[in-house]
């Protein structure tokens, strides 16, 4: 055989070995920088709100340079006796300003996010008396980088799955809870290192109430670890391949831009979604209250949508959309707000869900996972949960009309 061919085949085998390794008999994929960048941009798309992937990408690249390995394991390959937990920040719109001022005057040290993220996993692990063997993404957006960094720091994989598939405004809004698995025990760390365990709660709504109140009383910021699950449970209570989908979204939009194609068209095709609107932001009335960002958004149509208006109700995330006063999309289906030139989530550099005035935005609607469309899923994330009187209508039906 030709020596060049032999060398080429050897090189291919080495690449395959680098991409898929076996740790303790487990099939684990080592993610490269391109896959990680695509994942983080795709996660911002999945978030259903404004999201800037660049800070997360910077953190991941710095970690790679320092020698960190980012590993991913599929739900099917994860052992039944393994333990996964979700890690994320929890915010609080309308934080207690007097607490912020007092802690500054006291000179209390604000712990780095990376330290708190690991502290909160240690806290839940100690409480459970079991080692955490993988991290599952709690929600899309910045929580993806959090999960990746915690997993890499602990030299464990991230699960190719999620407990929401999107970003959600409230803790109880999760696929495990729909599947009968509670988020408790839940561990919380404040910016200054206060440690809180929610051992028991009446229901998931109380977990949301308590953890959100801690965030509001902590300058609008806390870190939470929740929803411990074993390998048996994740097989029915997690969204499989959720991170692979994020990689796909990031990849198709990137490649479309690189080849001078329309990234929005590429994403609509990849997500089996619908282009709902193109327009400029002419109104964004924002109010931080009870731990959330509440926003009324209005867009003025451009291009094929000239002469039309689009209104969006936001509670941290995009919840309801109206085209010219008619219902057009609603939670739990996904409403993405994207830059039409890049296909990436718009970047507001402001509060959760913010829309910069004058920004050009493409709105895409995507059918949600089947779990969200169950009776309980609609109770948790449907329009009536957010105070509206109408029933949930799937986006396919709304667009057919």
Where are these regions (language model features)?
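Catalytic or ion-translocation cores adjacent to nucleophile or general acid/base/metal-coordination motifs
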Residues: 63-78, 156-194
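C-terminal non-catalytic interaction/assembly regions of soluble proteins
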Residues: 283-401
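Glycine-rich oxoanion-binding loops at beta->alpha junctions
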Residues: 83-131
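Oxyanion-binding "anion nests"
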Residues: 248-301
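Short glycine/serine/threonine-rich phosphate/pyrophosphate-binding segments
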Residues: 53-58, 117-118, 140-149, 165-169
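A structural-propensity feature for long, helix-poor, extended segments
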Residues: 80-101, 173-214
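A short, small-residue-rich loop immediately preceding and capping a beta-strand
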Residues: 43-48, 130-139, 158-159
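N-terminal low-complexity or amphipathic/hydrophobic leaders
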Residues: 34-94, 347-369
């Amino acid at each position: 055989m030709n020596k060049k061919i032999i060398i080429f085949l050897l090189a291919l085998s080495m690449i395959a070995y680098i991409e898929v390794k076996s740790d303790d008999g487990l099939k684990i994929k080592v993610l490269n920088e391109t896959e990680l960048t695509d994942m983080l941009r795709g996660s911002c798309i999945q978030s259903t709100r404004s999201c800037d992937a660049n800070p997360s990408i910077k953190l991941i690249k710095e970690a790679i340079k320092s020698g960190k390995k980012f590993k991913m394991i599929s739900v099917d390959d994860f052992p039944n006796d393994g333990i996964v937990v979700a890690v994320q920040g929890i915010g609080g719109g309308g934080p207690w300003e007097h607490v912020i001022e007092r802690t500054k005057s006291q000179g209390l040290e604000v712990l780095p996010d990376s330290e708190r993220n690991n502290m909160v996993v240690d806290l839940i692990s100690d409480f459970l008396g079991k080692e955490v063997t993988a991290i599952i993404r709690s929600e899309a957006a910045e929580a993806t980088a959090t999960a990746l960094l915690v997993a890499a720091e602990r030299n464990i994989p991230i699960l190719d799955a999620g407990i929401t598939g999107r970003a959600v405004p409230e803790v109880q809004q999760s696929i495990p809870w729909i599947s009968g698995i509670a988020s408790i025990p839940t561990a919380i760390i404040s910016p200054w290192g206060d440690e809180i365990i929610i051992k028991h709660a009446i229901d998931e709504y109380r977990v949301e109430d308590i953890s959100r109140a801690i965030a509001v009383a902590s300058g609008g910021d806390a870190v939470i670890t929740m929803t411990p699950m074993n390998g048996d449970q994740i097989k029915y209570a997690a969204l499989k391949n959720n991170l692979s989908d994020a990689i796909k979204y990031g990849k198709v939009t990137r490649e479309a831009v690189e080849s001078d194609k329309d990234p929005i068209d590429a994403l609509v095709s990849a997500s089996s979604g619908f282009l709902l609107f193109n327009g400029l932001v002419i109104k964004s009335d924002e109010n931080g209250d009870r731990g959330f960002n509440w926003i009324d958004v209005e867009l003025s149509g451009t291009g094929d949508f000239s002469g039309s208006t689009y209104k969006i109700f936001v509670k941290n995330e995009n919840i309801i959309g109206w085209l010219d006063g008619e219902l057009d999309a609603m939670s739990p289906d996904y409403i993405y707000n994207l830059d039409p030139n890049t296909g990436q989530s718009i970047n507001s550099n402001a509060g959760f869900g913010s829309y910069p005035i004058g920004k050009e935005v493409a709105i895409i609607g995507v059918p949600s996972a089947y779990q969200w469309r169950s009776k309980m899923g609609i109770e948790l994330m449907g329009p009536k949960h957010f105070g509206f009187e109408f029933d949930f209508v799937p986006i396919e039906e709304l667009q057919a009309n």
